[in-house]
């Protein structure tokens, strides 16, 4: 295992243009609850007092279907329009910056098309466009929409500059997993190590993003491994990025890390956010060749496993995003380290919206 070296000029330069960030709180959050779902209601009841969410900031949907995937017409009728109505009725369109969905709110929208022209997307990523839609703008369903906030680290997040909502999800395998997210977000502290696990020492694009992330953080806080070995068993981890099941040498479902409160995760994996249903205990990751070993249509690692193991935030993908539209670790972790909250850190790192990305976590989580 090789620890990275730090170019101090890079670290100083990263924040050279950073503006003072205004403190955000529960009044800036719209919490979306499916009142037809017991788990969704229970999550809301726990989160509301923890973050001081005003009751007018709680948007109650009535979605009877239990499927994680819905078609476009149901998304518009049962999710997007009711949320827009909640924002308008409560006079919150401008003040709300973050939308938080919960278990019981559909996860993904099915649609025709393939590849970069696919009309399928994550519910949360489509909801990010709701602010602009409420202002009268329309967007094509096919393919990603450029994220105006991407890499704009020098500017505070405001609707005047960035006409979107930052949408995260409180989700896990069960209530205890989600309770853990909330509790750990409140206990987040600026300590621990950032672990970057390259799948080899080659100069692939994803590997270079990991190298750049390592150089943008204090060297005594970074572990970077460029060997073919998969990093496991690390302790005091506050950030992790790697290739997940796309690393040919990874065969175990869990990494066995000890995660600190506030720990964030990125993986370069196509379908890690495909479901929050719990796999059988004996299931583990595999290859695309062995269909019998797949879970929920894929053999790949799962976002929910990181949350279950103790991470506080994790990105994921409901369908194939393509590497260039993954969150960028070289943007996420420096932003988080330098004071951005969870939602802003992840969305700064994502090139596209109306796409396959989800962010699991409390948007207000911040290192202190």
Please tell me what each predicted stretch does.
Residues 2-3, 51:
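Basic side chains
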Residues 3-21:
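Sec-dependent N-terminal signal peptides of Gram-negative exported proteins
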């Amino acid at each position: 295992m090789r620890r990275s070296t730090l170019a101090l000029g890079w670290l100083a330069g990263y924040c050279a243009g950073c503006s003072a960030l205004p403190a955000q709180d529960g009044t800036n959050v719209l919490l979306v609850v499916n009142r037809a779902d017991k788990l969704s209601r229970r999550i809301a009841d726990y989160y509301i007092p923890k973050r001081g969410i005003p009751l007018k900031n709680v948007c109650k949907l009535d979605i009877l279907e239990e499927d994680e995937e819905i078609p476009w017409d149901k998304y518009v009728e049962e999710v997007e329009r009711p949320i827009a109505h909640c924002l308008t009725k409560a006079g919150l369109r401008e003040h709300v910056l973050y939308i938080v969905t919960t278990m019981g709110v559909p996860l993904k929208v099915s649609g025709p098309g393939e590849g970069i022209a696919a009309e399928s997307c994550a519910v949360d990523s489509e909801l990010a466009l709701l602010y602009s839609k409420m202002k009268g703008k329309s967007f094509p369903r096919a393919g990603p929409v450029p994220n105006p906030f991407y890499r704009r680290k020098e500017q505070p997040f405001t609707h005047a500059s960035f006409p979107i909502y930052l949408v995260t999800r409180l989700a896990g395998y069960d209530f205890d997993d989600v309770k853990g997210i909330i509790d750990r977000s409140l206990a987040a502290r600026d300590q621990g190590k950032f672990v970057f696990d390259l799948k080899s020492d080659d100069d692939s694009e994803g590997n270079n993003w990991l190298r750049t992330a390592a150089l943008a953080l204090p060297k005594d806080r970074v572990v970077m491994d460029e060997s073919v070995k998969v990093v496991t068993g690390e302790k005091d981890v506050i950030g992790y990025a790697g290739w997940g099941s796309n690393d040919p040498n990874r065969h175990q479902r869990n990494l066995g890390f000890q995660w600190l409160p506030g720990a964030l995760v990125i993986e370069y994996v196509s379908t890690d956010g495909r479901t929050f249903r719990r796999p059988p205990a004996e299931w583990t990751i595999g290859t695309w060749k062995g269909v019998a070993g797949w879970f929920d249509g894929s053999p790949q690692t799962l976002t929910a496993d990181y949350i279950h193991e103790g991470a506080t935030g994790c990105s994921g993908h409901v369908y194939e995003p393509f590497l260039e539209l993954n969150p960028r670790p070289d943007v996420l972790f420096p932003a988080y380290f330098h004071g951005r909250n969870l939602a802003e850190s992840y969305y700064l790192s994502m090139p596209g919206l109306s796409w396959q990305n989800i962010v699991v976590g409390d948007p207000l989580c911040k290192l202190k």
